[in-house]
Each structure stands twice: as C-alpha cells, then as structure tokens.
Amino acid sequence: MLEEINYDTKLFGLIGKNIKYTLSPYIHNFSFTTLGINAVYLVFDLDEMKFNRIINGLLEIAEGLNVTIPYKEEVMKYLDNTDTYSTRIQAVNTIYKKGGYNTDYLAIKNLVRKKIGNMSGYECYVYGAGGAAKAAAFALSELGCSSISIVNRTNLRANELVELLNKNGYNASIKENCNSTSNIVVVNSTPNPSVVPENCIQKSELVIEFVYKPVETELIKNAKKYGIKYIDGLEILVNQAVEAEKIWFNKSVSDEKIIEYLYARKLVW
C-alpha cells in the first residue's frame, strides 16, 4: 500500500467469514508498495447475510478480490466468467474484473512440481472436501496421481467431490483413512492439523498442509521427524498470492521476498 490513498487508488481485498487471522493484507500491501502500485488491500469479514447483500457492490468497485472460506463456491454465481480450471474445480479464490480464477490450484501444482515432479504411481489422500480440497485434488490428479482418496467428516461433501473428480476422468473414491503402504501423498485441507494419523505420515512421500498459523503444525512436525518431504501452509498461502498478483498486474514480488518480510515483521512463527 502506498503512503497516500487518492482518487486513482485501486481497491483489492479478501472476502471470507471469521478471517481476522488472515495474512493476506500484509502480503498484498507489501507487494503493492514494493512494486509501486497505487492500490490498497482490505479485509471484508462477512457473515452469509452481509455477503449476499454486498457481493455485487464489491464486484463493481473492486479491481480484484480473493475469496476464502466459506464463499469459494458460492461466489461463482455472481461472476461474469470463470477460467477453465476454476470451472472444472467449481471453486474460485481469485477474482479480477468479475472473472474467476483458482490460484490454490496453481500453487499446489507449482510447489509439488518443485518437490517431487511427476506424480505417476502415487496414491493421494486428501483430508477435507471444501474449496481447498477440490483445488488440491485436481492439481494432484493433473500431475499424474494414480488415485485420489477423499477423507472427510461427512460423506455428503466427500461424495460430491468424488463425483466431480470422476466426471472429469480421474480415479477418486471415499476412504475412512489412508491404508496404503507406499507412494503416498497426504493433503490436509481442514483447519485441524492433527486429523492425519501419524502412521499415515510415516508412509508418505510428501505431506501438504494448508494451515499456516503456526507454520510448523503437528503435521509438519511429524513430517520433519520422519524425514518426509513437505509443503507447509505458508508456502501455499504465499504462492497462491503471487499467482493472484500475476493475474491482476502481470507481475509480482517473489515468494522468498514475501516470506522474508512476514518473518521480519513477526507475523508468522
């Protein structure tokens, strides 16, 4: 964010519910300042009633928006169009001029490619069945995962995600827990880092965690303990933010520079 807000300042922001914890304003306002962009990034913490009342107005006045829980799916009906990935995933987390995108999906693809590359022959277990789970499941499937198993508290959401994946030509099913012995990738898209059993982590080749406060969750601690490769929630948060800025401005600050800033400000630990 530049020091002075004026007539030409562009509005960006995050839409969600119960999101006081978010780091997104720090990330994007730091990027705007670093890149010399005349813009401000705000948080719109909305319950369902407020969301339905003001979403159209926000879409009219904001240059770009991010969307988080619980509106990644609901927001789609208010948009003029969605790109190929978000249409298939049926979830949007980035908006630019009333167009919807999914940078969670892009972040998972980017980060997994760096860690292990091709996913051929891997069995992937995704804990959760919301918007983040959808993005992760599609990204891993497109990277070549041989099967996707959805582990969720309720079968209704899990069934919907399995049907969506299978409709798109992927091999998906519901599991109560991971029961494979090798070549496993585990994703936690729930708010609970302890939902993944330790014996499942031990058998994994890669662990992916969406929770980023603290950065070293119980899941990440266990991955480190057993020498398992991992992608932590901060890496995902920052990379999806960088991908959003590329959509908005066709340029961005590097992941490394943003993470360094967040640690320097003691915003993460």
Swiss-Prot record:
One of its GO terms (biological process) is shikimate metabolic process. InterPro entries: Aminoacid_DH-like_N_sf, NAD(P)-bd_dom_sf, Shikimate_DH-bd_N, Shikimate_DH_fam, Shikm_DH/Glu-tRNA_Rdtase. CDD domains: NAD_bind_Shikimate_DH (cd01065). Keywords: Amino-acid biosynthesis, Aromatic amino acid biosynthesis, NADP, Oxidoreductase. The active site is at residue 72. GO terms for molecular function: shikimate 3-dehydrogenase (NADP+) activity. NADP(+) binds at residues 128-132, 152-157, 210, 233. The keyword Lipid biosynthesis does not apply. Gene3D superfamilies: Leucine Dehydrogenase, chain A, domain 1, NAD(P)-binding Rossmann-like Domain. Its EC number is 1.1.1.25. It catalyses: shikimate + NADP(+) = 3-dehydroshikimate + NADPH + H(+). Shikimate binds at residues 22-24, 68, 93, 104, 212. Pathway: Metabolic intermediate biosynthesis; chorismate biosynthesis; chorismate from D-erythrose 4-phosphate and phosphoenolpyruvate: step 4/7. The keyword Zinc does not apply. PANTHER family: BIFUNCTIONAL 3-DEHYDROQUINATE DEHYDRATASE_SHIKIMATE DEHYDROGENASE, CHLOROPLASTIC, SHIKIMATE DEHYDROGENASE. Homodimer. Belongs to the shikimate dehydrogenase family. Involved in the biosynthesis of the chorismate, which leads to the biosynthesis of aromatic amino acids. Catalyzes the reversible NADPH linked reduction of 3-dehydroshikimate (DHSA) to yield shikimate (SA). This is Shikimate dehydrogenase (NADP(+)). The lineage of its organism: Archaea, Thermoproteota, Thermoprotei, Sulfolobales, Sulfolobaceae.
